[in-house]
């Protein structure tokens, strides 16, 4: 997705930077902020699943994207962690009134994040993007909660904080060929057959020397 930094007026960028800095220094409870120095118009966050909900124990990564008309137009919100929720589409898009008709320029990003967290506590089946989840919420809450908790266990309980990071089992940097810590297999160990070869060479040299000495003796006669 293209950055909107160049499209936003300087005064808006200053306000966004100020608010993001404040959020990072003092985030709402259960929410972490991962600001990007390169693109302030795309804010990555993580939200802890609220206790007493099917999402408890999970950490859900999310991002807010500020368009070129922000703050006149609300930001767009996306869950990056897969979640079973009536108001979250299959591609992670979030449907909540504060990001649509109830948006006001003065609300700010903190209000948006708190509203999305509240959405995990009180889903709204009337504006469902995931119709299956919305139907189960209304007709069979036990099944809805079971499905939501299962996906939380699978996708949101990886033991990470939600921060973008490299996989622990990813490729590791190769050691330099001259690294003194790099151990060469077989280094310092006797090579099989070396002793035998040296012995054979020594015996050959002795036989050749004896033949030379014999020829010299015959010449003297």
From Swiss-Prot:
Record GO biological process: anaphase-promoting complex-dependent catabolic process; cell division; exit from mitosis; free ubiquitin chain polymerization; positive regulation of ubiquitin protein ligase activity; protein K11-linked ubiquitination; protein polyubiquitination; ubiquitin-dependent protein catabolic process
Catalytic activity: S-ubiquitinyl-[E1 ubiquitin-activating enzyme]-L-cysteine + [E2 ubiquitin-conjugating enzyme]-L-cysteine = [E1 ubiquitin-activating enzyme]-L-cysteine + S-ubiquitinyl-[E2 ubiquitin-conjugating enzyme]-L-cysteine
GO molecular-function term, one example from the UniProt record: ATP binding
Function: Catalyzes the covalent attachment of ubiquitin to other proteins. Acts as an essential factor of the anaphase promoting complex/cyclosome (APC/C), a cell cycle-regulated ubiquitin ligase that controls progression through mitosis. Acts by specifically elongating 'Lys-11'-linked polyubiquitin chains initiated by the E2 enzyme ube2c/ubch10 on APC/C substrates, enhancing the degradation of APC/C substrates by the proteasome and promoting mitotic exit.
Extent of Basic residues compositional bias: 208-221
Domain UBC core: 11-157
Active site: 95 (glycyl thioester intermediate)
Lineage: Eukaryota, Metazoa, Chordata, Craniata, Vertebrata
EC number from the UniProt entry: 2.3.2.23
UniProt cross-references to PROSITE patterns, sorted A to Z: UBC_1, UBC_2
InterPro entries attached to this UniProt entry: Ub_conjugating_enzyme, UBQ-conjugat_E2_core, UBQ-conjugating_AS, UBQ-conjugating_enzyme/RWD
PANTHER family per the UniProt record, alphabetical: UBIQUITIN-CONJUGATING ENZYME E2
Pfam family, one: UQ_con
Any one GO cellular component localisation term in the record: anaphase-promoting complex
Entry annotated with the keyword Repeat: no
Biased composition (Low complexity): 193-206
Region (Disordered): 158-221
Stored SUPFAM superfamilies: UBC-like (SSF54495)
Pathway listed: Protein modification; protein ubiquitination
CDD domains: UBCc_UBE2S
Key words, A-Z: ATP-binding, Cell cycle, Cell division, Nucleotide-binding, Transferase, Ubl conjugation pathway
Organism: Danio rerio
Protein name (record): Ubiquitin-conjugating enzyme E2 S
Similarity comment: family membership: Belongs to the ubiquitin-conjugating enzyme family.
